[in-house]
């Protein structure tokens, strides 16, 4: 929907409708809510993974340290060392996996922030561009209106000066001059077309030879 407002010499200038601006703001709000929901889902996924790892670690702690129960029959000191080393290795791998997940999550968050900043900058630039275009359009309309008013005033003064008959004869003379200029331009166009056809014919003849 477009409203119209009177400005200066204008009678009807279209301006943005408040309903259109409200719809645009609602759409932006819905997009922001959708992005926040996606972020929360990612956070919940990472937290669920961390809680699972934490519960697994607590379960191992409740079962007691490796030396808390008698080693299997026939197990040597070297076997116990190997099992302890494997356990440390698995723990280190889990910690690395946790760090990797956290780093990936933080990276996604930073990328999302960068995308939001970029969209906000693009939106601000687009708004500024549209505002500038609207201002230029209004100024152009104002200049056109001022020029028309000036021409109308000049014609009115000329008509008052020459009278209706004199002004009519002047207009007829201007029309005859414009018609003569139009005939001259048409003749120049015909001459140019004839010259083009002449050279085109010569080129075609050369190619055929």
Swiss-Prot record:
Transmembrane segments: none
Domain of life: Viruses
Nuclear localization signal 2, short sequence motif: residues: 116-120
InterPro entries with a match to the protein in the record: HTLV1ZIPPER
Ranges of compositional bias, category Basic and acidic residues: 72-87, 94-160
Motif extent (Nuclear localization signal 1): 87-92
The keyword DNA-binding belongs to this UniProt entry's keyword annotation: yes
Subcellular location: Host nucleus
Alphabetical UniProt keywords: DNA-binding, Host nucleus, Host-virus interaction, Inhibition of host innate immune response by virus, Ubl conjugation, Viral immunoevasion
GO biological process, one term: viral process
Other remarks on this protein: Expressed from antisense transcripts. While mRNA expression levels of HBZ-SI were similar to those of HBZ, HBZ-SI seems slightly more expressed at the protein level ex vivo.
Family statement: Belongs to the HTLV-1 HBZ protein family.
Descriptive protein name: HTLV-1 basic zipper factor
């Amino acid at each position: 929907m477009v409203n119209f407002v009177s400005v200066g010499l204008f009678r009807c200038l279209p301006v943005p409708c408040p309903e259109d601006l409200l719809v645009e703001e609602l759409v932006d709000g819905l997009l922001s809510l959708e992005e926040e929901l996606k972020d929360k889902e990612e956070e919940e996924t990472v937290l669920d993974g961390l809680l699972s790892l934490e519960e697994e670690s607590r379960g191992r702690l409740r079962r007691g340290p490796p030396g808390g129960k008698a080693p299997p029959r026939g197990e040597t000191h070297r076997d116990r060392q190997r099992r302890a080393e494997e356990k440390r290795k698995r723990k280190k791998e889990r910690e690395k996996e946790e760090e990797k997940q956290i780093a990936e999550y933080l990276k996604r968050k930073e990328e999302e922030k960068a995308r939001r900043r970029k969209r906000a900058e693009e939106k601000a630039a687009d708004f500024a561009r549209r505002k500038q275009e609207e201002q230029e359009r209004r100024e152009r309309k104002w200049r056109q209106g001022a020029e028309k008013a000036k021409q109308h005033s000049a014609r009115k003064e000329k008509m008052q000066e020459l009278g209706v008959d004199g002004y009519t004869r002047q207009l007829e003379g201007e029309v005859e001059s414009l018609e003569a200029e139009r005939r001259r331009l048409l003749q120049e166009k015909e001459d140019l077309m004839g010259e083009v056809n002449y050279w085109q014919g010569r080129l075609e003849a050369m190619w055929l030879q």
